Amino acid sequence: DPKTMKTLSAMLDSGCIINGHTAGVSGKKLNAYVSSGILSCHEPTNFDQVLERLRLGMWIMIREGSIRRDLNEIIPLVLSNTTYTNRLMFCSDGLDPFDIIEFGHIDHCIRESVKLGLNQIDAISMASKNCFDYYNMGKDLGGIAPGKLADILVFDDMTKMKPRKVFVGGKLVVSNNTIVSAIKNQPVPKWMTKTVKLKKYTENDFFVKSNSDFADVNAINMKTEIITERISESLSVKKGNVIPSFDKDVLKVAAFDRTFGSAKHTIGFLKNFGAKIGAFASTWNFHENNMIVIGSNEKDMAIAANSLLRTQGGM
């Protein structure tokens, strides 16, 4: 695609680091992908995928988050194959706030990897030094040495890896789970409270029109929580509107441009969502954070959408 290649070239000319997304790609396609200047990937779900990418010079972010957890699959084979870890890192690819409270963030990746047998220093390096080397930030970060920024975690031991002290810029900010440095209250900019630039909706806004008694529609089939595919479904039509089906687990799904208020939107169908609901709406979603509405009937979908308009976002 010429437009994509032009964008990649502009980023490389500006010295940018381009992160990749190579789910399901291998062989010649992966070689072509790497040749474009993309240096990393967080999508490998098994060791073979990790190894293929490492051999092509890529950096790998091993994912452990609310969407997928890949440490258990990958770390033991990294160890048994004595694979170098200097181009391995951790990432979450999205974490639920409740998971952060219960498990932690990248510190959780360190602890889990150590439990799986990874050397503690290698695990810490994958969470710090390797990342800064990848992003060309090693001059200032990634080690404790003269001339580097003093952003430091102090652990009690090398097994639990629970931070006892936290220094930011050389200043102690947390000690024994207590914030010891004053935190300035920053006023929320007004523009941040007015980001859902949408109109009020009625059920008519969620109609999918058809003149037949039945309609064959394209639908997004959720094979897993991550993998989807396009399928065809036959749905009933009432009063010129294609309706969802609880029996087939097919709901309506709509997406609206909440950021620019352009009135751009699309309405389709979603299979295997797995919830018998009136409607669900959210402005928190990967990656656009537009307003998504899922529902079994248009009236409830309009109510859910208007609720987010009133609250200026949320779920």
Predicted regions and their residues:
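Structured loop/turn residues at secondary-structure junctions
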Residues: 45, 65-66, 158, 296
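Active-site microenvironment of metallo-dependent hydrolases
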Residues: 101-117, 121-315
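Active-site glycine-centered loops adjacent to acidic/histidine catalytic or metal-binding residues
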Residues: 93
